[in-house]
């Protein structure tokens, strides 16, 4: 069963694969210690069972048991580390946002709420378990997005240069469906060994070998458990090392091997199409930000904002006056809380959800992001089509997406390298 829409795969990829409690366990044990947390043997067994069942249903080959287990353990470790980061920085997913995400899942699977619940039960989950797992994965994704955003610096000159190039292009933009194999070269490892293997894999692939099977067996990349499938992307959405290699190759082309800082890469172009949408919705909103401190608790910040909303509704004070006096976002406070016309994608998920769903002129309930507690009011929405502003927004998104993918990969590697991880010997491995 496919629960997730394509655009949610990157946000919730581990959910159906690695979270299932279909059967009560009489005995359980710790499989991996990850910092102060643990991964249970039942989690590993459930993940392996689900992957094998899905592979059997889809008639997909799998690598040897030891290789598959290693990949599953590594994915569970990475997921756990991201969830720990979400807890550390205090990311919370409220019920309203969770409900919207679940509605979106049902919609994209062409299911009613009842049909989704039935499908979840077939996967071995109760509906409350499913909800909490979605909440957990959304929190981990939000933490990753927020922490990686802080590492990204985009200069105005970069945006202007790319916007000028985009203005010279035609409206149609080619999209590629690509698959990827990454052979990692660790410190002290002989690079020639990895290069020899990479050349052999390319030769085998060009002679008809199955790419997904090769990815399962050899890839150390982020999509190894999906057979290396990265899905549909425009070149500007790809990591730079991919985009630099793809010119105008045809469907079925094998590209590589080519080097990066982490090892050797092989790409396959599974399909090509040339469609692009250019309409952009921009939102002008204003907000008030209150940051919790040692003295001011979350509850205190929320209460203060609720009082602000009530005072505005009573006509005692204006939103602009309160923003100037109290908002702890210096940039917008000087503008009476106004953020100007921006595309919603530029904001963190909770803020984006509010400005996308609020009616114009309505003030939100207080809500929390990684920056603190907010209230927001949407002042206006407008559609922008091929203006200078739209081109610059598009250029910014392109640069952001490229740098985000690169920085996210580096962040995960740093997170993994700095973590205390101990994989405990499984009794099954000793038999």
UniProtKB/Swiss-Prot annotation:
Signal peptide: 1-22
Reactions the enzyme catalyzes: [protein]-peptidylproline (omega=180) = [protein]-peptidylproline (omega=0)
InterPro entries attached to this UniProt entry: OMP_Chaperone_SurA, PPIase_dom_sf, PPIase_PpiC, PPIase_SurA, SurA_N, Trigger_fact/SurA_dom_sf
Pfam families on file: Rotamase_3 (PF13616), SurA_N (PF09312)
GO BP terms in the entry: chaperone-mediated protein folding; Gram-negative-bacterium-type cell outer membrane assembly; protein stabilization
Keyword terms of this UniProt record: Chaperone, Isomerase, Periplasm, Repeat, Rotamase, Signal
GO molecular function: peptide binding; peptidyl-prolyl cis-trans isomerase activity; unfolded protein binding
One Gene Ontology cellular component annotation held by this UniProt entry: outer membrane-bounded periplasmic space
Residue intervals of the PpiC domain: 173-271, 280-380
Localization per record: Periplasm
EC number: 5.2.1.8
Domain description: The PPIase activity resides only in the second parvulin domain. The N-terminal region and the C-terminal tail are necessary and sufficient for the chaperone activity of SurA. The PPIase activity is dispensable for SurA to function as a chaperone. The N-terminal region and the C-terminal tail are also required for porin recognition.
Protein name: Chaperone SurA
Native source species: Vibrio cholerae serotype O1 (strain ATCC 39315 / El Tor Inaba N16961)
């Amino acid at each position: 069963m496919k629960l997730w829409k394509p655009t949610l795969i990157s946000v919730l990829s581990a959910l159906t694969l690695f979270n299932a409690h279909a059967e009560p366990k009489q005995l359980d044990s710790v499989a991996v210690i990850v910092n102060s947390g643990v991964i249970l043997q039942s989690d590993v067994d459930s993940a392996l069972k689900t992957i094998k069942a899905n592979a059997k249903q889809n008639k997909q080959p799998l690598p040897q048991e030891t290789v598959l287990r290693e990949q599953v353990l590594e994915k569970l470790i990475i997921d756990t580390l991201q969830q720990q980061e979400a807890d550390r920085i205090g990311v919370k997913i409220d019920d309203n946002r969770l409900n919207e995400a679940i509605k979106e899942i049902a919609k994209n699977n062409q299911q009613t709420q009842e049909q989704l619940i039935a499908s979840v039960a077939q996967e071995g989950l109760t509906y409350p378990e499913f909800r909490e797992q979605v909440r957990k994965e959304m929190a981990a994704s939000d933490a990753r997005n927020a922490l990686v955003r802080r590492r990204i610096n985009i200069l105005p000159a970069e945006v202007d240069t790319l916007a000028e190039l985009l203005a010279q292009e035609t409206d149609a933009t080619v999209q590629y469906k690509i698959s990827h194999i990454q052979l990692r070269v660790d410190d002290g490892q002989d690079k020639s060994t990895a290069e020899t293997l990479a050349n052999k894999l390319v030769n085998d692939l060009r002679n008809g070998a199955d790419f997904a099977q090769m990815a399962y067996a050899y890839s150390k990349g982020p999509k190894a458990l999906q057979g290396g499938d990265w899905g549909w992307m425009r070149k500007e959405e790809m990591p730079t090392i991919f985009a630099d290699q793809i010119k105008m190759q045809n469907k079925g082309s094998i590209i590589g091997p080519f080097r990066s800082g982490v090892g050797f890469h092989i790409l396959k172009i599974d399909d090509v199409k040339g469609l692009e949408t250019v309409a952009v919705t921009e939102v002008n909103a204003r907000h008030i930000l209150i940051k919790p401190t040692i003295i001011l608790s979350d509850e205190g910040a929320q209460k203060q904002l609720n009082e602000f909303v009530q005072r505005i509704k009573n006509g005692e004070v204006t939103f602009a006056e309160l923003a100037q006096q109290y908002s702890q976002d210096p940039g917008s406070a000087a503008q009476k809380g106004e953020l100007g016309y921006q595309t919603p994608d530029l904001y963190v998920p909770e803020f984006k959800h509010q400005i996308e769903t609020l009616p114009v002129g309505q003030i939100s309930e207080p809500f929390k992001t990684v920056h603190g507690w907010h209230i927001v009011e949407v002042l206006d929405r407008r559609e922008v089509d091929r203006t200078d502003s739209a081109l610059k927004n598009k250029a910014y998104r392109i640069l952001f997406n490229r740098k985000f993918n690169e920085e996210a990969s580096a962040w995960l590697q740093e997170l993994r390298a700095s973590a205390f991880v101990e994989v405990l010997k499984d009794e099954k491995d000793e038999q």
